[in-house]
Amino acid sequence: LSLVVPLALGVILAGCTSEPVMQDGIRVNDPFESGNRRIHAFNKGFDQRVVAPVARRVSAGGNEAGEPGAMDLVINAGANLSLPGKVVNSLLQGRPEPAIRNFFRFAVNTTLGMGGLLDPAGTDFGLPEVDTDFGETLAVWGVPEGAYLELPVLGPSTQRDAAGKVVDLLIDPVYHLLHRDAAWAAFGLRAASKAGDRARFGDTVDSVLQDSADSYAQLRLIYLMHRRHELNQGGTEIDPYADAAADDVIDPYDP
């Protein structure tokens, strides 16, 4: 964790360099908007040309017999590999209960769920995943949110969460315990699971990215409100994957 302090300090200093504004009832700190919009344009093109087609192929691997399809297996395996890192973060936050739940979920799915391809922990033992990350750990430690960022390929974030993504890679037990090739394979599987998520919520993601009057502002609004609610730091809960018609998507610039 030797990098945590300088990273967190950088977030604090950078987050104090601009004055947030109120937009649609929430505080928005976006001093890098022009650069963020350029990255957003790249991300939209990348999603349209690469991610969405892959997601559609993954989705096509499903079946109608109630059995898990390729999409479900990929999502399950990727989510299972993320659990050791969540255990570490819960412990760093001083929250032993979710750490224990995620540990047992990982143990059950790895042993009884064919290495995590299946989810007996959730379906048979009532052990749902308790989601967390190092961005939340920084929030628990009192590090401010910082400015809004859109990251290449990864999408919406903040300075605090961006720093958290870097540290999550550094502290993840999976990458320390596995051989280099196996660790890269695990990373690829987790990335593929994101394509599975994209397939599962494809219509709604398309409505936000392709049908919004201002998809950058719309995505920023959804992310900030959802993330702050998730961290109990204010903001109304918005499920970015809730079923909604394109006409119902909020345009934050609509008077």
Label each PLM-derived region with a short phrase:
Residues 2-14:
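Bacterial N-terminal signal peptides
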Residues 11-34:
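Bacterial Sec signal peptide processing site at the extreme N-terminus
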Residues 18-26, 136, 140-255:
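A structured, mid-to-C-terminal "fold-capping" secondary-structure block
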Residues 28-63:
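Post-signal-peptide N-terminal segment of Sec-exported extracytoplasmic proteins
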Residues 49, 70-79:
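Short, surface-exposed glycine/acidic/tryptophan-bearing loops
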Residues 50, 54-58, 66, 92, ...:
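Non-catalytic, solvent-exposed segments at the cell envelope interface
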Residues 61-73:
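Active-site flanking loop/helix segments enriched in acidic
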Residues 76-159:
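Mid-length scaffold segments of soluble, non-membrane domains
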